[in-house]
């Protein structure tokens, strides 16, 4: 042995390095997941604080049928609450107004028979 590592030693070093990399990546993924869960919990707390029960039910119904629109509404309500533009709680009528503002007009068409 003249100081050159054998194939077995090289293989062991590679395995150790791969395990270290996997541990580092796993740790970062858990941190991101925890941050996302915390952000979601904060968002839900803000919504619960600023929406009445009726408005919350309406929002949940919209989220079930149109998830993207529901997310937009949630983001809008959170932004309004954080900027201080919400006075009291948003009731069901105000939620209807928000929904009508943020949802695109549905295209309707008439069929005419001759």
Swiss-Prot record:
The protein, known as: DNA-binding protein rrnAC3180
Coiled coil: none
Positions with biased composition (Basic and acidic residues): 12-22
Superkingdom of this protein's organism: Archaea
GO CC list: cytosol
Gene3D superfamilies hit by this protein: PDCD5-like
Keyword DNA-binding tagged: yes
Biased amino acid composition, Acidic residues: 1-11
